[in-house]
């Protein structure tokens, strides 16, 4: 007697969306990460038709937008955890810089998105979304620097300028990683680089 087929439960739209994002970041993390991720390539990796992809996201741009939002949320949680561990502003900033750079090192696909390399053939609005990501990172630094007056009784001459400098430092590390195809170690000279930044907190 033939046993009845057991139907596996269908994944919800949200579960499928998460699966698509996981596969997308996996493709960007791979050795072929610098190659353009077409919907055909993505659909094949997910195991669905191209048409099915658009049941979960209206466009490829929306996939990247969702991925950038996810990156933002993840990194923000890491940053918040890092700054809670330190009492001084200088040590909190140092910990955050280290965390951001380590996140970039461990996630090549993320870094390729944030430097724009993975978005070269995509909708120009995505570049604006990445710019918004860095604006948010700068604002987090501004908030930490402004808290120094309450925590330590000292204020910086220009928190916004210093925050912009710290974000530029992070962006430079991202670009260096991509340029070296992630063969460089951003932590190799981190302590020496921090020794140049530290006097700004004295």
From Swiss-Prot:
Matching InterPro entries: DNA-bd_HTH_TetR-type_CS (IPR023772), Homeodomain-like_sf (IPR009057), HTH-type_Tx_Regulator (IPR050624), HTH_TetR (IPR001647), NO_SlmA (IPR023769), SlmA-like_C (IPR054580)
Localisation: Cytoplasm, Nucleoid
Keyword field contains Cytoplasm: yes
Protein keywords: Cell cycle, Cell division, Cytoplasm, DNA-binding
Pfam families (alphabetical): SlmA-like_C (PF22276), TetR_N (PF00440)
Gene Ontology biological process terms, A to Z: cell division; negative regulation of division septum assembly
Residue ranges occupied by any HTH tetR-type domain in the UniProt entry: 14-75
Any GO molecular function: sequence-specific DNA binding
DNA-binding region: 38-57
Record carries keyword NAD: no
Cellular component, GO annotation: bacterial nucleoid; cytoplasm
PANTHER family, sorted: ACREF/ENVCD OPERON REPRESSOR-RELATED, ACREF_ENVCD OPERON REPRESSOR-RELATED
Complex formation: Homodimer. Interacts with FtsZ.
Function: Required for nucleoid occlusion (NO) phenomenon, which prevents Z-ring formation and cell division over the nucleoid. Acts as a DNA-associated cell division inhibitor that binds simultaneously chromosomal DNA and FtsZ, and disrupts the assembly of FtsZ polymers. SlmA-DNA-binding sequences (SBS) are dispersed on non-Ter regions of the chromosome, preventing FtsZ polymerization at these regions.
UniProt similarity note: Belongs to the nucleoid occlusion factor SlmA family.
NCBIfam families reported for this sequence: PRK09480.1
Record-given protein name: Nucleoid occlusion factor SlmA
């Amino acid at each position: 007697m033939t046993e009845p087929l057991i139907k596996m439960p269908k994944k919800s739209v949200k579960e499928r969306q998460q699966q698509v994002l996981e596969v997308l970041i996996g493709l960007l993390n791979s050795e072929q990460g610098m190659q353009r991720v077409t919907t055909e390539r993505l659909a094949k990796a997910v195991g669905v038709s191209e048409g099915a992809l658009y049941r979960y996201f209206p466009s490829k741009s929306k996939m990247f937008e969702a991925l950038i939002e996810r990156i933002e949320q993840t990194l923000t949680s890491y940053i918040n955890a890092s700054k809670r561990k330190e009492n001084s502003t200088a040590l909190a900033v140092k910990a955050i810089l280290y965390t951001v750079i380590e996140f970039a090192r461990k996630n090549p696909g993320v870094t390729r998105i944030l430097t724009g390399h993975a978005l070269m053939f995509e909708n120009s609005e995505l570049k604006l979304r990445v710019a918004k990501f860095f604006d948010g990172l700068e604002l987090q630094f501004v908030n930490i620097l402004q808290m120094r007056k309450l925590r330590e009784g000292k204020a910086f001459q220009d928190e916004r300028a210093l925050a912009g400098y710290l974000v530029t430092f992070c962006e430079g590390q991202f670009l260096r990683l991509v340029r070296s195809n992630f063969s460089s170690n951003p932590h190799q000279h981190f302590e020496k680089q921090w020794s140049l930044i530290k006097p700004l907190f004295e």
